[in-house]
């Protein structure tokens, strides 16, 4: 499988089966991380981690505190598309990491980025 990253009218294709998405909460300044798998059904959220807790970021039932991180497995199905929009309130956007390295996405307020599994041709799938 491949991950398509759509931004500013362009598509970047990463040949990966999994990735980690991380960002800083705009109010609490707390770090969030999510592990995703790229599947034919969509992007599957496997595990999420929150560094602490605070306003609007309470860990869900069943979360385990380990080394300062609340770790849990979200109960959501595959997502055809994940849309990220920068607030500009944190000074940075998202970090997307794979076994190949990391990319910084959406640092500027108003930047919209979409993540989705690529079609068999390596391009964005029709919506």
What are these regions, as identified by a protein language model?
Residues 4-59:
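N-terminal secretory signal peptides
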């Amino acid at each position: 499988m491949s991950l398509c990253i759509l931004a500013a009218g362009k598509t970047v294709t990463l040949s990966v089966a999994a990735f980690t998405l991380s960002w800083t909460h705009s109010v609490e300044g707390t770090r969030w991380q999510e592990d995703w798998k790229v599947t034919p059904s969509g992007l599957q959220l496997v595990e999420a981690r929150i560094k602490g807790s605070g306003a609007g970021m309470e860990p869900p039932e069943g979360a385990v505190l380990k080394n300062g991180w609340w770790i849990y497995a979200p109960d959501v199905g595959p997502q055809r598309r994940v849309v990220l929009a920068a607030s500009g309130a944190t000074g940075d956007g998202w970090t997307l990491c794979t076994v190949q390295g990391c990319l910084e996405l959406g640092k500027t307020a108003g930047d919209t980025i979409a993540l989705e599994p690529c079609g068999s041709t390596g391009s964005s799938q029709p919506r």
